[in-house]
Amino acid sequence: MAIRINTATFQSDLYRSFAFPQPKPLRSPKFAMASTIGSATTKVESTKKPFTPPREVHQQVLHSMPPQKIEIFKSMEGWAENNILVHLKPVEKCWQAQDFLPDPASDGFMEQVEELRARAKEIPDDYFVVLVGDMITEEALPTYQTMLNTLDGVRDETGATLLLGLVWTRAWTAEENRHGDLLHQYLYLSGRVDMRQIQKTIQYLIGSGMDPRTENSPYLGFIYTSFQERATFISHGNTARHAKEHGDVKLAQMCGIIAADEKRHETAYTKIVEKLFEIDPDGTVLAFADMMRKKISMPAHLMYDGRDDNLFENFSAVAQRLGVYTAKDYADILEFLVGRWKVADLTGLSGEGRKAQDYVCGLAPRIRRLEERNSARAKESVNVPFSWIFDREVKL
């Protein structure tokens, strides 16, 4: 899930693409911005078509990975069976949404729903804004599987390929699908939110796709998913903590069980990148620096409800204020991945590789310093209406 920091506290280009972009009209003219290591300047186009919201789309480089590197991923097939598929659970051992929700076939269904709604009444609107944003992000799952299938060397050419890496992609999608199911059904039963506006937002988001700037490269793609899965783990873990603080232990269990899934998935994706560092350290550190220079733009950054052109920014600002996902978390994830992949210990790199190594190893402290400076200049927050909660206002 993608969240940005409060725009009142962060005004830097450093966060423009990841979850903390500056609020600006999405119908702005084209503008140029820096892109990748060794690449030319790219542009961002603002488009408006009948079935999609106003949006910014980068003119991406396509198929940037040298074709010969596809062999690296073919060689990892046997390794994936013992190191990646182990992070999936058999379907019969997986939790399902119904395990946590009132049973519509039971005589006590209505009483169970009333109990759920009574607990939900004690939870403030700003929490529901964040929970809805998390759920909408989870519900755009078709986009995420599509994104993985754009990656050269690891795409599912038939839709049912039995190569182990592609078995992972489909099974990962199936596990993730339960997350949106659970949160969607909970929110429907809670009576606290405008389900039609939420469902419109989901349709807009899936129709808009996503713009991760991964260039069909599995190097970039798996670095992206490693970052994203850890971000989602942190976010769901914090919504679980907040639900417990508001007295809803059952909702806390729902968010917590989703966070546990995200942690397993994070482990798998970080192991893939760890293997790439072992096989091709120079190419992998260049890819890591590339993604961090472009900033990780998370899946829901094209979120729209038919009304608010800055919906994602506003949702993210609420999450930042509540401490569900913050600029500090962004820096912490980067620092975690640098350590997990032992980037500082890499040797035998090219000149460009050493520059990339220095860049990623020094970036987290720079982000924290920038956060401290901008927090000191923080302006007073404003209240903004959210259609998801019947246009009630929430402080950003």
Swiss-Prot record:
Q: Name one GO biological process term.
A: fatty acid biosynthetic process
User: Which cysteines form disulfides?
Assistant: none
The record's listing under InterPro entries reads: FADS-2_CS, Fatty_acid_desaturase-2, Ferritin-like_SF, RNR-like
From the UniProt record, which GO molecular function terms apply? metal ion binding; stearoyl-[ACP] desaturase activity
Main localization is plastid
UniProt-annotated location(s): Plastid, Chloroplast; Plastid
This protein's pathway reads:
Lipid metabolism; fatty acid metabolism
| Stored Gene3D superfamilies | Ribonucleotide Reductase, subunit A
State the UniProt keywords alphabetically: Chloroplast, Fatty acid biosynthesis, Fatty acid metabolism, Iron, Lipid biosynthesis, Lipid metabolism, Metal-binding, Oxidoreductase, Plastid, Transit peptide
Q: Which domain of life is it from?
A: Eukaryota
The UniProt record lists the EC number as 1.14.19.2
Residues bound to Fe cation 2: E176, E229, E262, H265
**Residue range of the transit peptide in the UniProt record, numbered on this chain:** 1-33
Name the residues that bind Fe cation 1: E138, E176, H179, E262
Cofactors that this protein relies on? Fe(2+)
Cellular component terms (Gene Ontology) = chloroplast
Q: Kindly give the PROSITE patterns that the UniProt entry links to this protein.
A: FATTY_ACID_DESATUR_2
Comment on bound cofactor: Binds 2 Fe(2+) ions per subunit.
Q: What does this protein do?
A: Converts stearoyl-ACP to oleoyl-ACP by introduction of a cis double bond between carbons 9 and 10 of the acyl chain.
Family designation: Belongs to the fatty acid desaturase type 2 family.
Subunit composition? Answer: Homodimer.
Q: Could you identify this protein by its name?
A: Stearoyl-[acyl-carrier-protein] 9-desaturase, chloroplastic
